[in-house]
Amino acid sequence: MDNSAITSQSNPTPLVCSVTPIIVGSPPSPANVIELSSPSTPPTPLTLLASFSKTPSRKTTSPDSNGENTICHGVRQVRRVPRNNPGREKKSITGPSKEHKQRTRSPKTTTRREIKIVEGDRLIVGHDKREKKGATTKRMKKRDGVADKKLYARVSKVKSSENLDLDAKIPSSKVCNNTLPLVGDDMDNESSELQLEQAIKRRHDWTPAREVTTPVVDVAELHSSPCGKAVTRMHGVGTLLSDYGFSGVVETSLGTKSESFRNAPTTKRPMELQKFSTVPAIPTPTESSTTEDIQGSSSKQQRVKAKKPQKGKLTTITSHATAKYCVADQTVDLDYIQNVAPKSPGRKNISNRPSGMKHSNSGRGKSSTLKNDNGPPVFRVVPPLEAFKSFEGQELLFGTSSQLERGHPEYRCDETQDIQNSPSNSAAVSELAVPYRISSEGKNLGSSLFRLSGSKNLWSASARDLTGAVFEVDEIDFQEPSMGLSVLATKSRCHPGNRGPPRRNLVDVDNVPDKKLDIDTTEGENGNHSSVADNIVDRENLNPKISANTSETNLECAPRNKPAFSRFTTSELAKKVAAYGFKPIKSRDNMISLLERCWETQSKTFMPESKPNQGTDDARKNGFRKENHSDVRVRPDSATLANRRSPKKRQAKALSKFQEPNNFLPIENSTTTASMLPIEHVISSHTILINDDQLSDSVGETVSFLPTLDHNGNGTTLQENMLEIKSPATPNARHSRQRSSSTSFSIEPPSLASQITKAIKSQPRIRAFNGLKQPTWYEKILMYDPIQLEDLAAWLNTDGFGRIGEDREVGPGVVREWCESKGVCCVWKKQVSGRSHCLPMVS
């Protein structure tokens, strides 16, 4: 390092001597010999060099010609001169080994001085000769009064061995002095070596890594040297500047640290980073067998086993559908490799075996081999036939809208009635409309309505008894080899009394579609009828009436007086209730009230022209006489059996003119006919629902049988038997029945619920407006759209009821009850006032 830049602020040494200052710029003079020390204590060369920068007095010397160097108060201060200053000069002081010479850009002649330390007793300061270098010497002209100077010094006595050992310990760069360091010269010299200008530009794009090395300071050296603090300070400044130097070599190793940092005392434990960029390949069966013991012990120490998920049964449709896409959550470790690799049947899993256990344990290896149940189920594509069969065992959940769309029986019955109108399709109609079969070859007759016995759907679930239990389908065998069967079906309408609203507690059963059945009998005209004498039931008188216009006989009877059901015994009441097709009722009062309501209903529907016969009172006194309440058999007449078969044209004519069979009519002996045809009456226990305590909106249905006689001029003949099944409480049937009847009856208006349903279904489709579809109310219900009660009530009162000929009006409250009964999603219209909704009364 330059001698002019080495200073120190330490205390003055005891070897201070008077030194004559040398002023740069003075005229050349011969070398001066200065005595620096006494022979007893010879100074060191470093002390001699430091003494040249001090003056014996505190006088301030005059500045030189260039105004560069000044000496104030015994301390030399250096001031940097700008580059454009022509008087700037660079000085170099040669040390004991090298001689540095620098050339300035100033055109003036520079002065050089040298300090030569000669081993001896003298320090010689002398002049240096100018060196000439080609073209450069021409530009550098010497000024007057400026000359090169050299300093020569000689040590008076040789250093002792102790001082040499002390100097050898101190490095040459660690020079201490009492003066402050010369920052200017240090920056100039280091700027050329460190390339600070390039480093500053490079710093904008790159920040050097933080210094990871810990400087280690020799404690013994600090105690032995009085300038330990200065040495540490100089090293700190030097390393701070040298960190920003670019050596030209880029270190690629990450996380490398010097050995000195490992030995230095630290408070943090270094962490070793492991590279996971490469995953070990799946070993082959031969390789894994040789290395599985080593890998099993090492992998168990380096990883943590993940908690296995608990197995759960697939209970939802979503879990079944997404099971084949589920992937087990496992870590990338040896377990995952072993699961993917093919396993031999007798091999044991490495992850489940402890590290100390050897593979030679074959006995336990077999017991630990289990089938893999943790994986997702294997998805198997089934054939189409098996897939269709799976739908039969699937539990289907239907909403009320689906019932309204597909489950209502009137749609099927309408299709059946259209097919029945054609005579050629009588065989096909027999299988479509009738859920049971009647024949004389021994076939069973099912007693279900609307396919109740065939399929367990919502209609069968709705057939319940008084206790709430589901009805069981009863199958009655009507096999009778000695005679044929003649079946005609009607339905009975039972109106309640004067209790409650007029249409609220109505049990209304409409007509059923016609079904033509063949009549086969093997009995002769004069057959013996004594075997079925006990099966003849005298119910009420049959009044046949022959109409000249339609050539059709209508059999109607109307009792004059109401029977006193309270005088009947309990068994007689039970028989009468069973004759109407109801389930047995335990309460006597409930049976009496039910029979009275049924009698009133029949009396309203009877024709006023019908007249009772003589056997009416006898039938009431005798009651019912039959062995089986579900069978009603009547003997056929010989004349009737002779004329039993009629032409097909007559059958087709009777079928087209057949409007609706009368309601359930009790049968008793008639004076107009010698005998009666055998009739079997099927009374199903689940075909009608009547509540004991109160009759609700539940619709009861029954199947009754009525013979239809045609007049040929010679006598009465049984034409055919019809079975018609139709939706209960259908307004169309009521209107057609009212129009077809010869006389006007007193028929109460239909219920508002049925009228609302009819009005909603009768609404035509609306055309799209500006490309937007306008769904009808029925379509909104099927799409589960919320129905605003006020809007639906307004539409019914203005447009809906007008299409079906209904004059009444409904309010939002009635519409709400209808929506809740049908399961339709309904909401109130938002009102600004916020007052609560009240259910309006309907008159």
Curated annotation (Swiss-Prot):
InterPro entries: Slx4_ascomycetes, Structure-sp_endonuc_su_Slx4. Phosphorylated in response to DNA damage. It is found in: Nucleus. Residues 26-111, 281-313, 339-377, 603-655, 729-748 are annotated as: Disordered. It comes from the Eukaryota. Keywords: DNA damage, DNA recombination, DNA repair, Nucleus, Phosphoprotein. GO terms for molecular function: 5'-flap endonuclease activity. Residues 50-69, 285-301, 349-372, 603-616 have a biased composition (Polar residues). Residues 617-636 have a biased composition (Basic and acidic residues). Residues 739-748 have a biased composition (Low complexity). The keyword Membrane does not apply. The keyword Nucleus applies. GO terms for biological process: DNA recombination; DNA repair; DNA replication. One of its GO terms (cellular component) is Slx1-Slx4 complex. Residues 302-311 have a biased composition (Basic residues). Belongs to the SLX4 family. Forms a heterodimer with SLX1. Regulatory subunit of the SLX1-SLX4 structure-specific endonuclease that resolves DNA secondary structures generated during DNA repair and recombination. Has endonuclease activity towards branched DNA substrates, introducing single-strand cuts in duplex DNA close to junctions with ss-DNA. This is Structure-specific endonuclease subunit SLX4. It comes from Ajellomyces capsulatus (strain G186AR / H82 / ATCC MYA-2454 / RMSCC 2432) (Darling's disease fungus).
